[in-house]
A protein has these predicted regions:
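C-terminal structured domains
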Residues: 181-239
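Conserved mixed alpha/beta catalytic, RNA-binding, or beta-rich assembly cores of soluble enzyme
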Residues: 1-198, 202-204
Length: 239
């Protein structure tokens, strides 16, 4: 049997919850067991499977750990340090999520590559001691954000990001967001703090999609953001 362990400080244990919830499909395929345990300072996810599934489970575990760093840790750093004047709290959230998603794929690949020789995935320790270049890159982004950022600037920034991406779409239905294969997206679960009712907007922005199809009526906060920043890239397909 092979054992794969993911560990995180209790203050960031939403990362472990995200990884577990995102891995249930693969765990089921392998017939693997998974347990979440807690002690005074840490939350641990322990997955056990037959040896033949080792590389399979490691691959998806490393992808999910990389996502937790490239979204959760990055957002926390940006939320703390990026506070330009000129934006409402809603628009600031849009800016933060847009910055996180702008080079998400690149960040995720970088993190995943450095996880290859890790035996126990201690996320906070790995971030603090093995990702110095990535932290310096993120600090450089923070330094580039002007002290004043207008709604027009934000619109131009979103237009630029969306125009540079390969076309892709997501689908909103009954309060949830789905990718092109109708797999439910849950990346916003990696974000702690911020506006309480903003989760579905974060999900759209973090998806990296260039188009949004609404199959049911979206909540007002999402509707406003889509009309303001996605415009014709949004399709409302409900009566």
């Amino acid at each position: 049997m092979v054992k794969i362990t993911v560990s995180e400080s209790n203050s960031k244990n939403l990362n472990v919850a995200y990884i577990y919830n995102s891995m249930t499909r693969y765990l089921s395929i392998c017939g693997a067991d998974a347990d979440i345990t807690f002690d005074d300072s840490r939350t641990n996810l322990v997955m056990t499977a037959e040896n033949r599934f080792h590389s399979y489970l490691r691959k998806f575990t490393e992808e999910r750990v990389a996502e937790s760093v490239s979204i959760g840790y990055k957002y926390a750093l940006f939320q703390k340090n990026i506070r330009p004047s000129g934006l409402s709290e809603t628009d600031r959230e849009v800016l933060l999520c847009a910055l996180v998603s702008a080079d998400f794929d690149e960040d995720k690949r970088y993190v995943a590559e450095r996880l290859k020789d890790i035996r126990v995935y201690s996320i906070d320790g790995f971030f603090n001691f093995r990702l110095q270049a990535l932290k310096e890159k993120w600090a450089g982004i923070i330094d580039c954000i002007p002290c004043c950022f207008t709604e027009r600037d934000l619109k131009d920034f979103l237009d630029y990001i969306l125009s540079e991406r390969e076309p892709s779409s997501v689908h909103f239905k009954d309060g949830e967001l789905y990718d092109a294969d109708y797999v439910r997206l849950k990346r916003a679960a990696l974000i702690d703090g911020g506006l309480d009712d903003f989760s579905i907007v974060r999900e759209v922005l973090l998806s990296g999609a260039t188009e949004v199809e609404c199959l049911t009526n979206p909540p007002p906060v999402l509707c406003d953001v889509l009309k303001k920043y996605f415009g014709s890239r949004t399709a409302f397909r409900f009566s």
